[in-house]
A protein has these predicted regions:
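Hydrophobic alpha-helical and helix-loop surface patches within well-folded domains
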Residues: 2-169
């Protein structure tokens, strides 16, 4: 759908290479071949999330993957982490799925951890451990020590409310 041919040309190879690398890393690390018959990428201009996985397909907000010419190294790293996160959900979230969204933390924790590991080789100049700590811990501690803290396991009666279970912890 991207109408800017230069933008498409500038991003296309990186998007496919990052997905291929994430898939290969997950197969090597888990010892489990990619579990679905296809792997589709769908870029949606006005999607409310950066990305959302489904068995065999990932939906992305178009702007999350199609970077401008002025994109920084941090922008490219954020794109790589998003791709790695959503790709890892093919194993942790789709192949292995919690019984119900009460335990949504399980798939998100694994996907976040795997994303950090997957992106490390592509960005050797980044201190990934420090970045993971600096990005994750302050947000989690801010929520966890205050009155807005949620239990790890959160009962969910209505699937329409599932979005309320996602947060910094």
């Amino acid at each position: 759908r991207e109408a800017d041919a230069a933008k498409l040309a500038r991003n296309r190879d990186a998007i496919f290479d990052l997905h291929a690398g994430a898939l290969a890393w997950m197969e090597r690390s888990t010892g489990i071949p990619y579990p679905f018959g296809k792997f589709d990428l769908v870029l949606i201009p006005a999607f409310q999330f950066g990305g959302m996985e489904h068995p065999g397909a990932v939906l992305y907000k178009e702007a999350s993957l199609m970077l401008d010419a002025s994109a920084t190294e941090a922008d490219r790293l954020a794109r790589a982490e998003l791709i790695a996160h959503e790709t890892s959900h093919m194993w942790f979230g789709d192949l292995v799925t919690m019984r119900w969204f009460d335990d949504v933390w399980m798939k998100e924790v694994f996907a976040g951890f795997m994303a950090a590991k997957i992106t490390e080789p592509a960005f050797p100049g980044v201190d990934h451990r420090l970045r993971f700590l600096a990005d994750t811990y302050p947000r989690a501690y801010r929520v966890d020590r205050g009155p807005g803290a949620n239990a790890i396991r959160q009962p969910l009666a209505d699937l329409d409310e599932a979005g309320s279970l996602y947060g910094p912890i």
